């Protein structure tokens, strides 16, 4: 767990945007998820979801940078909300709202904020961690395995 938290400092969070503006609050939320207390971890994950995948679609550029940390947290047995993390990763993997909107409204592609590309980058980030998901299929927790299977299925498309 310490290794993942050390890597947080290598991400330029101040330069990235989430749904609230600057993504500087994301490292604290990720660290809080590792607290071991289920209620605290779930509350932090809910707040993180609102910042990176609100309403089920990728909201800003910080999502892709957050995905590797979520994948690592999902592997740690001491993290109490691993199922919810996998569900969030599936939402990110399935996100195509900006891409679909750009088909109908191509001017969206000319905006300074490149939501379509941020969404694609986030999906690629989830796909890059397929091996992590496969490793969870052998876990004893049936709910975790089901969430991992659903995510693996979404990545198989």
Across the structure, where does each feature detected by a protein language model lie?
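N-terminal "cap/leader" segments of large eukaryotic alpha-helical scaffolds
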Residues: 1-41
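Flexible loop/turn segments at the boundaries of HEAT repeats in alpha-solenoid HEAT proteins
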Residues: 14-19, 55-63, 96-104, 112-123
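Core helices of alpha-solenoid repeat scaffolds
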Residues: 22-27, 59-67, 125-130
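Buried hydrophobic core positions in alpha-solenoid tandem helical repeats
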Residues: 28-30, 69-71, 132-134
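Alpha-solenoid helical repeat architecture
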Residues: 33-37, 74-77, 137-138
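Residue-level signature of the C-terminal ends
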Residues: 51-55, 73, 92-95, 136, ...
């Amino acid at each position: 767990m310490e290794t993942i938290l050390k890597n947080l400092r290598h991400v330029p969070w101040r330069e990235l945007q989430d749904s609230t503006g600057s993504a500087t609050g994301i490292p604290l939320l990720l660290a809080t998820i590792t607290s071991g207390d289920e209620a605290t971890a779930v509350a932090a994950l809910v707040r993180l979801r609102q910042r990176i995948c609100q309403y089920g679609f990728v909201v800003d550029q910080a999502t892709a940078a957050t995905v590797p940390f979520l994948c690592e947290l999902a592997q740690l047995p001491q993290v109490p909300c691993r199922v919810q993390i996998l569900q969030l990763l599936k939402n990110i993997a399935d996100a195509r709202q900006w891409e679909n909107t750009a088909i109908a409204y191509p001017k969206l592609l000319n905006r300074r904020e490149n939501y379509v590309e941020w969404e694609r980058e986030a999906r690629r980030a989830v796909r890059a961690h397929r091996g992590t998901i496969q490793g969870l299929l052998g876990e004893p927790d049936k709910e975790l395995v089901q969430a991992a299977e659903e995510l693996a299925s979404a990545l198989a498309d």
